[in-house]
Amino acid sequence: MKPSSPISLTSSSIARKARFSPYLFTLLAFILFVSVLYGEDFMCIFGQLEPNFVLPPSRTPEKNKKSEKLAFAIGKTEESCDVFSGKWVRDEVSRPLYEEWECPYIQPQLTCQEHGRPDKDYQFWRWQPNHCDLPSFNASLMLETLRGKRMMYVGDSLNRGMFVSMICLLHRLIPEDQKSIKTNGSLTVFTAKEYNATIEFYWAPFLLESNSDDAIVHRISDRVVRKGSINKHGRHWKGVDIIIFNTYLWWMTGLKMNILQGSFDDKEKNIVEVSTEDAYRMGMKSMLRWVKNNMDRKKTRVFFTSMSPTHAKGIDWGGEPGQNCYNQTTLIEDPSYWGSDCRKSIMKVIGEVFGRSKTPITLLNITQMSNYRKDAHTSIYKKQWSPLTAEQLENPTSYADCVHWCLPGLQDTWNELLFAKLFYT
């Protein structure tokens, strides 16, 4: 279609189109309202679509902005400050934020020093945004904010690692007889009795009901997700004040995903195959609907953590074929690096679904910054749940865990970003 000249509109042509103006005005007003009110959080998502995407500074005059103060916010960041865009800086003074031996809550799958990792280099890196500084993590402020409240991480084992990291960052300020941790099925609850506060983790790798919902036995190759079933888990999330969702890796079983239409109790199950992107889109829409129906935007905060990268293919960063995260002690220095495991098609789905939603939700855009950290995985330095074979012992790359992260380590920075976005919008 040939574009119209910018000066070709005559008074008659304007008159002919005048009957459309109310609809056009309404549409433009709505777009402007959403972009101003939630622009920061949604645009973080769009920035994720391309690793080198840089958000332009807002040109909207401050006096014309219609802002809504988010719950728990105590300040604002500079408009030019994108805390998710930056570089890793060596810091042996303020890192690590705690020692592995100081935190008894770290699971044996994440205690790399205890399981023989010979170096500590991965612990001495601090995230430095390009145009600003991250606010220092203030454990006292976090605990006082959580007084009488519930914070919950919902998702898979990567979100569980972030949950454990938060406990490690806070527990030293709580007297020994005033804290406890208990697991019941999918729910693990850390209680700070003195503060009448809980920090919780709920196992739901797809957020929706699935055949992988058992918190212990869930290694199922033929995964099935039930459509429209988020309330199966969501009833356990009601009443939470701060909630952090994640879901990604469990959807990545190939190009297709099995979706159950009906119930797992049906004798004849109606299971259909859909593209991974369409299945993930269904999950994102379900999550946003649940948030809209169950979270009070004036009193609560909702976060979504973007995909956590793996480093299973050394050729991605110029390594040898067959190489992975095993024995990696240096960072990836290419600022544009994007691992092949991070599907841009999925990030596009997130951008589309979140961008069309009016539900306020803050994206924790940890993907790019974590892409550089091939050194920070647990690798072989973790508890092995079954005896290693002679073949595995001869080839450590064959059983290296390039999904999960050592603690203390990278996931402490994820919580620093959560702290920054919670208190400084």
From Swiss-Prot:
Pfam families linked to this entry: PC-Esterase (PF13839), PMR5N (PF14416)
Protein's membrane topology: Single-pass type II membrane protein
Residue numbers covered by motif DCXHWCLPGXXDXWN motif: 401-415
PANTHER family named in the record: PROTEIN TRICHOME BIREFRINGENCE-LIKE 33, PROTEIN TRICHOME BIREFRINGENCE-LIKE 9-RELATED
Gene designation: TBL33
Keywords linked to the UniProt accession: Golgi apparatus, Membrane, Signal-anchor, Transmembrane, Transmembrane helix
Expression (tissue specificity): Expressed in inflorescence stems undergoing secondary wall deposition.
Cysteine pairs bridged by disulfides in the record: none
Protein name: Protein trichome birefringence-like 33
Species this chain originates from: Arabidopsis thaliana
